[in-house]
A protein has these predicted regions:
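Short alpha-helical segment of the dimerization/phosphotransfer core of two-component systems
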Residues: 106-111
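Conserved catalytic submotifs in the C-terminal HATPase_c
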Residues: 133-136, 158-168
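Short helix-loop "hinge" at the ATP-lid/N-box region of the Bergerat-fold HATPase_c
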Residues: 187-188
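Short alpha-helical Gxxx[C/S/T] motif in the catalytic ATP-binding
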Residues: 251, 255
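Long, amphipathic alpha-helical coupling/dimerization segments that relay conformational signals between
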Residues: 1-66
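Short conserved segment of the HATPase_c
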Residues: 219-231, 236
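Conserved glycine-rich
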Residues: 263-264
């Protein structure tokens, strides 16, 4: 029933205790040194084996947890979303039923996104990494498709999109689409709905720079550096207080992980006069 820290602490305490007993025992110095060296080697070997066993159990638990989330939760949600989508396409659906069915579809879609975010969070926090598959691709059509999907999902929001320069590179297009969906969705959720969300992708010599900007109440200065940490309670409370659709608050963290796995990063700026801007810098290679 030991934790990893407890195992290391026990072996750490054992080593000096045994060495002190050897020092007090009769015998030659050479014999004592030889025994101590052998003892240290044995302790190091047992400690290494114990850590390896512990990490294998952690990996097993992680894989089991991800399997439950990935199958047992996503499967029924997928069935709900698909059924709602089929009903929405049915021309015989009464008009009074359209709004409730659309609400079911949107809620199921939002839950699927939360589960995907939780899966990614669990992978990264339990020692894993996000699975990636990078290929040569153009980001312009991908981002335009993402903007169109979010505009359809949020008909009361306006999204302005523009791109310039070369947006080609080696990208995991699925992950970058996920990142853009998170950032734009965050801007829609926390921004002023009376003003548009602005999305800009610009190709530079060695990088592609993406900005997502929204007007509205600024992020407090003391929280700017914490917005990408899902375990910072203050940042979570701030995000959750801004609307009922805040979800798990993992979107920004996962977006930063996606940018970093491409060798880039995300910065945030926010003030009363200009609003909030998230800027993603991605190297092409």
């Amino acid at each position: 029933g030991f934790s990893l820290e407890g195992v290391v602490a026990e072996y750490t305490a054992m080593r000096p205790a045994v060495q002190r007993r050897w020092q007090a025992a009769p015998g030659t110095i050479d014999e004592g040194i030889t025994d101590i060296v052998r003892f240290d080697e044995a302790i190091d070997r047992v400690l290494s084996d114990s850590i390896a066993w512990y990490l294998s159990r952690v990996a097993h638990g992680r894989d089991l947890f991800l399997g439950v989330l990935g199958h047992d939760l996503r499967t029924p949600l997928g069935a709900i979303a698909m059924s709602a989508q089929l009903l929405l396409r049915d021309e015989s659906l009464p008009e009074r039923s359209t709004k409730p069915v659309l609400r079911i579809f949107n809620s199921a879609t939002r839950m699927q996104k939360m589960i995907n975010d939780l899966l990614d969070f669990t992978r990264t926090r339990l020692g894993g990494s996000l699975p990636t598959h990078r290929l040569p691709a153009q980001l312009g059509p991908l981002f335009r498709h993402t903007v169109e999907e979010l505009a359809a999902l949020h008909p009361d929001a306006r999204i302005d999109y523009a791109c310039e320069g070369d947006l080609s590179g080696n990208w995991d297009v699925g992950r970058l689409e996920q990142m853009m969906s998170n950032l734009i969705g965050n801007a829609i959720q926390h921004g002023d709905r009376a003003q548009p969300v602005s999305v800009m992708a610009r190709g530079a010599e060695d990088t592609v720079v993406i900005t997502v900007h929204n007007h509205g109440a600024p992020i407090p200065v003391e929280l700017i550096g914490q917005m990408f940490d899902p375990l910072t309670q203050g940042a979570l409370q701030h995000r959750q207080s801004r609307g009922s659709d805040s979800g798990l608050g993992l979107g920004l963290y996962i977006s930063q992980e996606i940018a970093r796995m491409h060798g880039g990063d995300i910065d945030a700026q926010s003030d009363e006069s200009t609003g909030t801007t998230f800027m993603v810098t991605l190297p092409r290679a």
